Amino acid sequence: MSSTGNGNGNANEINKRSPIAICGIGCIFPQADNLEAYWENIKRGVNSITDVPRATHWSPDDYLDPDPKSPDMTYAARGGFISPIDFNPMEYGIAPKDIEATDTSQLLGMIAAKEALKDAGYWENKDFDRSRTSVILGLTGTLELVIPLGARLSHPIWRKALKDSGLDDETTQEVVDRISDSYVDWQENSFPGLLGNVAAGRIANRFDLGGTNCVVDAACASSLSAIHLAAMELESGKSDMVLAGG
């Protein structure tokens, strides 16, 4: 979260070289659910790369193959994984029934944004010009929720393969239904729930921020690009404060 500290709203009076302050930070990292834990891990040199958590992610028994050329498999079973986080949907204006249709990046983004505002001292009893506060996030173009929703639409392929294998119509439909039940249902909130740009929009909407809200996809440089755009937004005088990151 960055601010020019100007607040007069007049772009012509803002020096292009005016200093930009990082006035608050909110974060969720592997083995660090908040800023204090993250900083402590840095000081202690904690390596947060771990084995894949089978209970919440995927089983190496299903996807691990030491041969890098093996199709549809992976030869790595380690990475940085965040811990399960409690999320109260009503606090963020989301109906509980819509949680499954909302990508985790949108949910985690709102948590991190709230923590950044609190860390900056803007959460309670401190006024600021919300109309000149922007949200710019770095986010990949394909979100996690796209995978199960897309897979659910493959039922014609499953049905054809089952029937070609000699199964009768009743058994085929039973198997198709069982496979479908393992994926997230499509519903009216699925499309906004899987769109990357909605991550910034949800933050702006929930916290009543009227400045620019958008996302940028620059692959591994997405978060840094978002911060770069946030700095440009501040230097141009279009915003007094920007929530930025990814």
Regions found by a protein language model. Name each.
Residues 2, 8-246:
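Cys-dependent condensing catalytic cores that perform Claisen condensation/acyl-transfer
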